[in-house]
A protein has these predicted regions:
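Short histidine-centered loop motifs in beta-beta connectors
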Residues: 59-67, 114-115, 188-190
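Active-site loop architecture of trypsin-fold serine endopeptidases
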Residues: 5-17, 57-59, 77-90, 96-118, ...
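PDZ/PDZ-like groove recognition
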Residues: 53-56, 111, 157-190
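A generic structural motif
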Residues: 1-3, 46-52, 106-108
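Short glycine/Trp-rich loop-beta-loop segment that forms part of the substrate-binding cleft
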Residues: 21-30, 63-84
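Catalytic-histidine neighborhood of serine endopeptidases
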Residues: 2-44, 54-55, 65
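Short, conserved beta-turn/loop elements at beta-strand boundaries and strand-helix junctions
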Residues: 41-45, 95-101, 176-178
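Conserved hydrophobic positions within beta-strands
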Residues: 36-38, 92, 121, 187
Length: 190
C-alpha cells in the first residue's frame, strides 16, 4: 500500500521493526482496524510503502502518467475531512508544475482536501496516474498530484526497507531538452 509520508510520519519509529499504532480500514468494513507496518519511506519525495496483511478485492494497475495531457479526465479517491470513500472528478489542468522539491507535478481541478493526500489519482481506465497531495489552503481549488513515474522509480528502494535519503550538492536544476530530446542538466540556482 502506497501513501504520502506526511500522512504517517508521526507514527514512524525507525528503531521499531514490528507493527505500530498504524492501521488501515477498508471501505467495505470501516469498523475493523487492520494493523499495518511501514516498510520504507522517503520524506523528500513524501512517499511511504506500507505492508498490510490482507488480500484486497481490487488492486489498481499503475498507469503511465507521461502520456497525460491538459484536459484529460481524472478522479481522486480519498477521505476528505473524514468523509470516507469519496471520489471526486476533474481534469489535468497542467502537466508540469514545479512547486515542490519533488520536481514536476500535475495540477488538477478535482476537489481535494487534506484527507485526499496519499490517495490515488486515477484515469478513466482505472489506472493510477498520480498520488494526490492536498492543495494550498490559501488558494482554494489549486490542487496537485505527483506523477506515478516518481513512484515507479522509488518503489524498488521502498521495498528494500527503511528510510531513503537524498544527497544535496548545493544546486538545483532540471533536465535540459531540445525538441523533446534530453541533452543534459540545466542548473537553475546554486
Amino acid at each position: 500500500l502506497v501513501t504520502k509520508y506526511h500522512v504517517i510520519s508521526n507514527l514512524v519509529d525507525p528503531k521499531y521493526k514490528g507493527y505500530s499504532r498504524l492501521y488501515v480500514k477498508l471501505p467495505s468494513d470501516m469498523e475493523t482496524k487492520i494493523p499495518a507496518k511501514v516498510i520504507g519511506y522517503d520524506s523528500t519525495l513524501d512517499l511511504a510503502l506500507l505492508k498490510v496483511e490482507i488480500t484486497p478485492d481490487f488492486v489498481f494497475e499503475l498507469g503511465s502518467s507521461k502520456d497525460l495531457v491538459v484536459g484529460d479526465k481524472v478522479s481522486a479517491i480519498g477521505t476528505p475531512i473524514g468523509l470516507e470513500g469519496t471520489l471526486t472528478a476533474g481534469i489535468i489542468s497542467a502537466v508540469s508544475r514545479e512547486i515542490t522539491n519533488v520536481g514536476h507535478v500535475f495540477q488538477i481541478d478535482a476537489a481535494v482536501n487534506s484527507g485526499n493526500s496519499g490517495g490515488p489519482l486515477i484515469d478513466e481506465n482505472r489506472r493510477v496516474q498520480a498520488i494526490v497531495f492536498a492543495g494550498m489552503l490559501q488558494f482554494q481549488g489549486l490542487n496537485f498530484a505527483i506523477p506515478v513515474e516518481y513512484l515507479k522509480q522509488i518503489l524498488p528502494l521502498l521495498y528494500q526497507g527503511g528510510e531513503i535519503t537524498h544527497s544535496w550538492t548545493g544546486t538545483y536544476g532540471h533536465t535540459y531538452k531540445v525538441k523533446n530530446q534530453k541533452k543534459g542538466v540545466e542548473i537553475q540556482y546554486v
